[in-house]
Amino acid sequence: MRYIKGRSNLSCTIFVPWDCKNHCKFCTSKQMYKERTCDIDAIIAQIKKINENPLIQEFVLTGGEPLADLEQCQKLIDVMEKPVYINTTFPTFAEIPGTIETAKIMTMIDFINKNDKIGGLNISRHMHQKFYEDVLPINVFAHLIKKHIKLNVVLSKEFNLEEFKQFVEPYRPLENVSICIRADYRNITKDTLKNRDDVFEKLILEYEYESSGGCMVCNDDRFWDGDTLISYHRGLEHSKVVYGNKIFVNDILITIDGQIYDDWDLVTNTEFERWIFGEFKLDEDVSEYENDPVYVDWLLKKNGEEGIL
């Protein structure tokens, strides 16, 4: 089998080795935190290897709740040599429900602003489900954050346009916030991934359509509501695509115990690890890598051969 980069912005998603208090319906990682042992040193060792691979453009920290332990989070960021994006609910971390501890919040915001490696935040705010933890109103703190914020709105029920408009209204004046409607991946198949479904039809009649894009396992439709970007994202449950003897990789996953995988089914594959870490030699057929000369150069030099750049 030959591993191929499936999308231009190939990223490495890392599950932080500490859990959150939420129980989101669509969450795929809750069981992991019950069954596996957290090992930050093993994760750091994998990050250092990933840093070398020029195919991988960025890191994503997810969880769990990355911002629940800023000290440990900083340890992970310190060893990264690529931009990192953080998935978070931006909880209040208050001891008393319904209160906001300003000092803790400002510490969190300073952490984000002062980390040059943090490229942005992906903040979850769901229309039909409340979190177990109190979360901060984005319109209260967004103007204090110097990074882009993508507001992820996961759909768990039928899409109601009027309800959606009311839901996002407080965020429209915020210049550093874009809205991303995310379909429940459990309801998407390869046959419906690129279809103009009911949500798309409602959005295009209400907002200014810009473009559509994506990769083999996801689709993004972009619209504008004045100066506010609204995107509609659909993704498949699995990020790996197999055709013949080729495996197209669209995401790289590192779990809380430092194991690395090519798909969300979390099945170990030593061939994949050799591809990611450059532990194989190119044969005469390198056509799949012609568009990535930097990767070819890195692989050759890693194996003691003369590079091409």
Segments from the language model and where they lie:
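Radical SAM enzyme [4Fe-4S]-AdoMet core and its adjacent flexible, acidic
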Residues: 126-248, 252, 256-257, 261, ...
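Core AdoMet radical
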Residues: 11, 28-40, 54-69, 81-104, ...
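Radical SAM enzyme core and accessory elements
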Residues: 1-4, 252, 257-309
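Leucine-rich repeat
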Residues: 47-52, 76-79, 109-115, 140-143, ...
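Canonical Radical SAM [4Fe-4S] cluster-binding loop centered on the CxxxCxxC motif
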Residues: 1-45
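Short alpha-helix within the catalytic core of nucleotide-sugar-dependent glycosyltransferases
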Residues: 72-74
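Short, acidic/polar
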Residues: 40-47, 100-112, 160-169
